Amino acid sequence: MRRPKDAFLSNPGRIYCFTDSVALGRRLLEAGARMIQLRHKTADDAAFRELAVEMLACVRSFGDAVLIVNDRVDIAIEVEADGIHVGQEDLDAREVIRRVPAEMIVGVSARYPDPAQSAAAAGATYVGAGAVFATPTKPEAVVIGLKGLRAVVAAVDIPVVAIGGITHGGIRPVLATGARYCAVISGINDAPDPAAALRRLLAESASFPTDQDR
């Protein structure tokens, strides 16, 4: 029986990737990605469903990798994705958790400690906290900085995925806050060679001790 939550929580890689295409997703998986979020804001439901089915088949071929769908709960359930990620302003976390299978990963965006605690109390698997730094992916995002990230980490006892402006050279300061994973979009996807960029980030994260090592 596949246990997505176990795979997510025990994953030794500390880089959380994003894709809007199977081609990019496969390149990242081949480079070592084991956590990928499928995120395509402009695709209609039919196109996104088809993309999700294809991407899930690709992820399954890599064994221990997991695919998390952004926002589209119905499609995540229908295609039996490993997880769903929702923004706190988009959908009620309790309602999402009530609807999805028990083994499905549920991530919730939470910029500050109070909403992070609410997400954890609702049963979220992890919270996504940021933007840690200014980011070209979402220029309007409020920047919480390392201090704000540290406050979110201290407020919950579930993993925190840090997001926003994280690039090569910035992994260790982020992980030093206690965040479990670093989500990287533009630092990988906009690089001349996304696979090489991911490998550099994975190497940087591997040099930082895990909770089990300390």
Identify the function of each model-found stretch:
Residues 134-142:
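Phosphate-binding beta-alpha-beta segment of Rossmann-like dinucleotide-binding domains, i.e.
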Residues 1-93, 97-126, 141-144, 151, ...:
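Conserved N-terminal beta1-alpha1 strand-loop-helix module at the mouth
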